[in-house]
Amino acid sequence: MYKKIFKEIKKYKIIVIARHIGVDPDAMASQIALRDSIKLTFPEKKVIAVGTGSAKFNFLGKLDKLEKFNNALLIVTDTPDRRRVDGPNVDDFDYAIKIDHHPFIEKFCDLELIEDTATSACEVIMKLIKNTGLKCNKEIAEVLFMGLVSDSNRFLFSSCTAETFNLVSEYLDEYKFDISPLYQQLYSRPLNEVRLEGYISLNMTVTENKLGYIKITDEIINKFGVDSASAGNLVNNFNFINEVLVWATITEDLKNDQIRVSIRSRGPGINHIAEKYHGGGHKQASGVKLKTFDEAMELMNDLDKFLAEYNSKEETLENGD
């Protein structure tokens, strides 16, 4: 499949690289690294990476303005379904390629590379570069590393395998980059975010079934001086609470007239419940966009019921019944 993708890349003089709405480091890093790799390999080609950016991730690189093209190739990274593509219309292109690591939802591109056991879209791009004639340099390798680290939550998730560590080791050895400043760029935070994290710790609801959740209203967002995306992303900071097995942030986003629910698990798969509410993602990291807090509480109730069943089964197994 890598060779097929490289063959299509060689064919086109104009290439547009997109990713999903609601930018995150892996999505942005994968498209920017792929853009820069193709430009390094084929300087004569016009290659752009598009979508709504975030000042928070400017250290990954700059995005380009979407233009109308004829006879162009579209590559979509880190996006499992058509409705979540940020910017371009897939049908406007001569040929489209998907490069993703999410569980399959729908086919919307001519050629699709889906590695749903990979940590990140960046890991898939790293393998694409390694197995084709695409070039890489220190700067591209750094961006890929940051995307992989972010989506694996610093190599925490079970999707991190020997292959993942071997791949990262090869890139570190070949491109000689220092990981310490990259971690600082990814994880340095303003004081107001840290204070909001403290508020969440104090006010999180925890059920007897080990579900933890917090409603972050627009009033709270303004009180702590953060944006909605940053508030919701704090979900990644609550991994190791003994009394919590599944946890969620329920964040009000007035700008987009929605309630964003980010769900994490350090045990059972929860993506099937997210899919029930027209969301999705990975087994241990999923998300949903809703219209009201009432809908979000229905989702929490479903998660709590699921956890009650899960815990009961685990207890039965432990007792050997």
What are these regions (language model features)?
Residues 67-68, 89-91, 105-106, 136-138, ...:
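Solvent-exposed alpha-helices and their adjacent loops that cap or buttress functional pockets
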Residues 102-170:
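Short alpha-helices
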